């Protein structure tokens, strides 16, 4: 990935202190990446335990079907690139168990960094670095896996 500086801004969209039956604070944060006159947005979903009053370790993991799939919580903002049903991956995301153990959980839909489809390359984070199409990538440039790692 290029060493170019990318401007990053954050906008808190949600800060609910009674999520997960009152045991967690749910935050939803829109992250905006800007460079070369181009912007890309990612939506971070985070749960933090309410019973721990100090900083906590947080599991950070991409999700593959959209933020709304990790829980049946009706207030999770759906991912922009996913129409998957709310909660359909909840069995793979032990949110309550993680919170009860005193950890946090943060997730972002991987499509927010690189939609996993060649015809949507221009929508990826790589466009910020002057690579609007797959044909514009230098020989040592990254593609999907590099974009996900960068994210």
Where in this protein do the model-derived segments appear?
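Non-catalytic accessory segments flanking enzyme active sites
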Residues: 1-50
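A generic structural micro-environment signature
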Residues: 14-19, 54, 68, 131-134
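Generic beta-strand structural signal
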Residues: 27, 42, 56-58, 101-104
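Short secondary-structure capping/junction motifs at helix and strand boundaries
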Residues: 39-41, 53-54, 71, 108
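Short beta-strand element of the alpha/beta-hydrolase
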Residues: 43-47, 54-65
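Cap/lid segment of the alpha/beta-hydrolase catalytic domain
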Residues: 61-151
């Amino acid at each position: 990935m290029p060493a170019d500086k990318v401007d990053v801004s954050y906008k808190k969209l949600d800060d609910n202190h009674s999520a997960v039956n009152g045991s967690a604070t749910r935050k939803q944060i829109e992250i905006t990446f800007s460079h070369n006159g181009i912007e890309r947005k990612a939506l971070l979903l985070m749960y933090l335990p309410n019973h721990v009053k100090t900083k906590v370790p947080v599991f950070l993991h991409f999700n593959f079907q959209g933020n709304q799939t990790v829980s049946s919580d009706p207030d999770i903002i759906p991912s922009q690139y996913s129409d998957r049903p709310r909660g359909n991956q909840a069995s793979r995301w032990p949110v309550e168990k993680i919170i009860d153990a005193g950890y946090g959980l943060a997730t972002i839909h991987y499509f927010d960094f690189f939609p996993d489809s060649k015809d949507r390359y221009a929508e990826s984070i790589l466009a910020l670095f002057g690579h609007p199409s797959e044909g514009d990538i230098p020989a040592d440039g990254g593609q999907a896996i590099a974009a996900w790692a960068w994210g």
